[in-house]
Amino acid sequence: MKYKLVLAVAVLVFSLPSQAERIKDIANVQGVRSNQLIGYGLVVGLPGTGEKTSYTEQTFMTMLKNFGINLPDNVKPKIKNVAVVAVHADMPAFIKPGQDLDVTVSSLGEAKSLRGGTLLQTFLKGVDGNVYAIAQGSLVVSGFSADGLDGSKVIQNTPTVGRIPNGAIVERSVATPFSTGDYLTFNLRRSDFSTAQRMADAINELLGPDMARPLDATSVQVSAPRDVSQRVSFLATLENLDVIPAEESAKVIVNSRTGTIVVGQNVRLLPAAITHGGMTVTIAEATQVSQPNALANGQTTVTSNSTITATESDRRMFMFNPGTTLDELVRAVNLVGAAPSDVLAILEALKVAGALHGELIII
């Protein structure tokens, strides 16, 4: 019996947005961001799925000392229901002391599962070393594991990672530049000089000339009210302002592992002929000129007609209608049974030859 392996290359052609987008959907306010917190703690109450590492014992002994319990030096606690964990959380901007945070708890040692455990009081610190929140509570673990006497094991999802909804209480807030200075700055999520200029123009059209100025391809600086109480309504108005983002530059994105190829709308091909192994791909382009009657009130138009063929040693040929695009080239190569690596090699050769007008990105 013969088995045939079919390698499929997924080709996606994306059209870049031409409709208006709200500023809040394409940009962030500089300085208004979340902050990462991390801590080191103990999970107790595990049903024999804990660990016996030296640092687990050391952490457990330190906790006992903090409670005023001192064990003799020659006594080592036998613990199977304890695990050392890393605790982390994201602290949103403007969150105030007393509010809650969701936390994620991950095992650091040899614990088999955190299911059924409880995190003891853990300090969550920022990069500056200050404590911003305190976490504690029962874990919610979606995964599980089970071991058989014969050495067999079943693991579902990840039993060594859990979450505690509202498991941390904020003790200190983080200052932001929102209420200080004479300016507010918007940072585009995708840098583009044209989009930055369009954003500044839209803001100036609403507020008046010279109220906004693009600093570079990412940042647009806006003069803000000096009265802090007016900045919320001021920013609420601006972030709902519509801006038409500029079209992205021509790009071809290739994932060599999965065979996925994403072709940008503005990618262009010049006439070229490619031979790759036993496969031949040919691109031809013809120009047609439409000249209106001399007495007609018309304009001369120039159109391009392209034809692409792909052949293998078995003489298979594929013909395409005029107006060749890169996705048609990729489909033609895929139809003759080319592997994703062959498609990638052809795209790289087209780029080097100057026949592919666009940025080739390999991920």
UniProtKB/Swiss-Prot annotation:
Coiled coil, from the record: none
Ranges that cross the membrane: none
Any GO CC annotation of this UniProt entry: outer membrane-bounded periplasmic space
UniProt GO molecular function: structural molecule activity
Pfam family membership, one: FlgI
Disulphide bridges: none
Cross-referenced InterPro entries: Flag_FlgI
Cell location: Periplasm; Bacterial flagellum basal body
Signal peptide: 1-20
Keywords, in A-Z order: Bacterial flagellum, Periplasm, Signal
Example of a GO biological process term: bacterial-type flagellum-dependent cell motility
Primary role: Assembles around the rod to form the L-ring and probably protects the motor/basal body from shearing forces during rotation.
NCBIfam families reported in the protein's UniProt record: PRK05303.1 (NF003676)
Listed PANTHER family: FLAGELLAR P-RING PERIPLASMIC PROTEIN FLGI (PTHR30381), FLAGELLAR P-RING PROTEIN (PTHR30381:SF0)
Annotated family: Belongs to the FlgI family.
Assembly behavior: The basal body constitutes a major portion of the flagellar organelle and consists of four rings (L,P,S, and M) mounted on a central rod.
Protein's name in the database: Flagellar P-ring protein
Species whose genome carries this gene: Shewanella baltica (strain OS185)
